[in-house]
Every structure is written in C-alpha cells, then in structure tokens.
A protein has these predicted regions:
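Amphipathic terminal alpha-helices
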Residues: 2-3, 245-271
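SDR active-site strand-loop-helix element
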Residues: 13, 56-57, 91-97, 128-130
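Oxidoreductase cofactor-interface core, primarily capturing Rossmann-like NAD(P)-dependent enzymes
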Residues: 103-207
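Terminal hydrophobic/aromatic helix or amphipathic segment near a protein terminus
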Residues: 205-245
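NAD(P)H-binding glycine-rich loop region in Rossmannoid oxidoreductase-like domains
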Residues: 39-78, 82-85, 96-101
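A short helix->loop->beta-strand "cap" motif at the edges of active sites that frequently abuts
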Residues: 86-90, 123
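Residues forming the Rossmann-fold NAD(P)(H) cofactor-binding site
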Residues: 20-21, 73, 112
Length: 271
C-alpha cells in the first residue's frame, strides 16, 4: 500500500546554498508550500504550521564576520529551539561524513554538536552525514569547481591520493524529500555518499573532459596556505586533506530513501 506523503509547508533554512537552491526547485514541483529562510527570519513563525523542516544552514567556508560556530552550531541551536514549539513531524539535517564531537577541526566538531541539538529537539530527526557533494556540469558547486581545470591545470591540496566518494547533488535532494515527506522512511543518522570511491586526483580527471595536468601541494605547505590565502581556512584545508570514505552500505541507505545513486562519470559524461 502506498503511503501518502505529507503535503503541508516545508521550511528550509540555508535555502540559498548549493543543495538548498536545488531542493527549492524540486519542492516547487510538489503541492507543499516552500518557506526559504535566512538568518534574520522568524523561525518560530515559519515553523508554526510546517509539516517538515530542512536545516541546511552551515558552511565549510565562512566569510568574515561569520564564524564556524555561528554558521554551523548557532543556526542549529536556533532551529532546535524553534522546533520545540512546532508541530513539525520531521527535521532533516545535512551533516558531514567525518563529523565528531571530539574533533579538533571546529567545522567537524560544530557539525556533530549541531546533530546533537537537532536530535534533542523533540521532533523526529533524519541526519545525513554526507561526503563531498557535487552538482551537474552547469552548476558544479563549490567543491567540484575547485577541481575544474583553469588553463589545463588543477592544483590539489595534498598529494591527491586522499580518498573520497563524491555524492551527486540531485541524489541528496531526493533523499531529503523522502526523509521530510514520506512517513514510511526511517529516522536516525545515516552515512550518505556516492557509489564510487576514488582519489582526489581521479576526481579531478573525471570532472574534466580534456586532458589536464594535476599538481599536488605538500601537506605542510597546504596547511600554511590555509592560514594565509583568503579563500581558504585551516578547517577547510584539513577536511580536504583527509579521507572521506563511508563505512556503511550507502547504496542500501539510498534505497531506503527512494534514491538510486548516480555515478560521477555518468553525470559529467555530457559536458
């Protein structure tokens, strides 16, 4: 028997980001009212009659005066506080695959603390611990854009041998929809990643249709660049230097949320 999806309003924090923008487009195909929210919006009012809340606020690359705590933890605390007075039946949160409460990296630590806050809100929560997310060729997103060649070259942080399982943006969007609106989907915390594990160098080659040259950056130099280059931070460099490889069956998780995972080579084949 087919379970009827929730048809009430869906509130989306951080709705202007890579995934939030795509999610809003997808939600507009459904009968649900979409409520995109920014930092200054009244969350309690927006959540007041919402069926579901999707918390996207957060960033690996905050711009001053924003901070890692303000962007990744304080926004989650505000969402959790507003949820406590809301009739919402689900809250969905995108965390990061290697988030840990004891992490020395403040981005990873605040992501883990944000998870705790949302689990404690009283609203059934679905938390996806995502690997690096990439978009299609016409909207690659910040991570993929860093691996697209300029003048035939790609500069890699570290040796390029670090491992990742990049996750397609539209697969994330579909999983969020099912988690938020389908009452039959489970709650809990789930690792979510793409179907193929590869090195950072292989990722770069798959994103570029023409032959490219890659050049690695020694780890110590990469960490120094994270402190002096305005577009980098120590936390971002640390994340990009590390492996992000799932230890759970992500294909099974995808199926539980109505998703058949896309392969990077197929998504970017037509570029």
């Amino acid at each position: 028997m087919r379970v009827t999806w929730r048809t009430g309003p869906v509130a989306v924090t951080g709705a202007s980001g890579q995934v939030g923008t795509a999610l809003r487009r997808r939600l507009h195909q459904l009968p649900n009212q979409v409520r995109p929210l920014g930092r200054k919006d009244d969350l309690a009012a927006a959540f007041g009659d919402a069926d579901a809340v999707v918390h996207h606020a957060g960033t690996l690359q905050p711009r001053k005066p924003n901070t890692y705590r303000a962007a990744n933890l304080d926004t989650a605390l505000a969402t959790a506080a507003a949820l406590a007075r809301s009739p919402a039946q689900r809250v969905v949160f995108l965390s990061f695959l290697t988030a840990r409460l004891d992490a020395s990296n403040s981005y990873l630590r605040y992501k883990a603390e944000a998870e705790e806050a949302l689990r404690s809100s009283g609203v059934p929560a679905v938390i996806f611990r995502c690997d690096h997310i990439y978009g299609p060729p016409d909207e690659p997103g910040p991570t993929a854009s860093a691996f697209v060649a300029k003048s035939g070259r790609v500069m890699l942080l570290g040796s390029g041998t670090q491992r990742l399982a990049p996750l397609y943006r539209e697969d994330v969007v579909e999983a969020i929809l099912h988690a938020a609106l389908d009452p039959a989907t489970p709650t809990g915390t789930f690792q979510f990643a793409g179907p193929d594990t590869m090195s950072a160098e292989e990722f770069a080659h798959l994103l570029n249709s023409k032959p490219i040259r890659t050049r690695g950056t020694p780890v110590m130099l990469a960490r120094l660049l994270g402190r002096v280059v305005p577009t980098l931070t120590p936390e971002l460099v640390d994340v990009m230097l590390g492996d992000t490889v799932p230890t759970e069956d992500v294909a099974a998780t995808a199926r539980r949320f109505g998703v058949e995972l896309h392969r990077l080579a197929d998504v970017w084949r037509s570029q």
